[in-house]
A protein has these predicted regions:
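Extreme N-terminal leader/targeting segments of oxidoreductases
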Residues: 1-11, 29-30, 132
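Short coil/turn connectors at secondary-structure junctions
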Residues: 7-9, 30-33, 51, 151-153
Length: 162
């Protein structure tokens, strides 16, 4: 008979992409014992393929940008069938999340006056994408992994959930 090792967690997060890592970090910060399961090696999630950047109305390149304009662009881009509240929350929270990543060690491209550089992307009225060259997803995963591991999140790699 095979023997199995058992673990006891308050929260088990399945998937170690950007969303799974961020959920694990949030739960751990609340004092909850977290286990994170990924089917491959940590850092191999699809988030690393994201090249363009993170849409956030930081107003670093054009000071006319704000969360309401970002929200309107998001709704228009989704032909108004998006979940209204989720689009609104994203537009409101995105600048805080970008600064959070930066405080955790993410290294974004910079303007001449050392603000986070933003570039144009389809459907956005103003330059809004905070980026790290064409490796934004890789930098985001690296930052979230490092922060999560330093918080003591237990990571189980190469596991299958059935």
């Amino acid at each position: 008979m095979d023997s199995y090792k058992t673990f006891d967690y308050d929260v088990l997060v399945i998937g170690a992409g950007g969303a799974g890592l961020r959920a694990s970090i949030e739960a751990s910060a609340a004092g909850i014992k977290v286990g994170l399961v990924c089917k491959s090696l940590l850092g191999k999630a699809h988030t690393v393929m994201a090249e363009g950047g993170i849409a956030a109305a930081l107003s670093n390149v054009d000071d006319r940008d704000d969360w309401k304009t970002h929200f309107a662009d998001t709704m228009r881009g989704g032909q108004y069938v998006n979940n209204y509240r989720m689009a609104e929350l994203h537009a409101q929270e995105a600048p805080t999340r970008v600064h959070e990543l930066e405080s955790w060690g993410a290294v974004f491209d910079r303007t001449d006056d050392q603000k986070i550089l933003q570039r144009n992307f389809g459907g956005h009225k103003y330059p809004r994408l905070a980026h790290v060259g064409d490796r934004t997803g890789l930098e985001m995963i690296r930052t979230l992994q490092d922060h999560g591991i330093h918080q003591g999140i237990d990571v189980h790699m190469e596991c299958t959930i059935i």
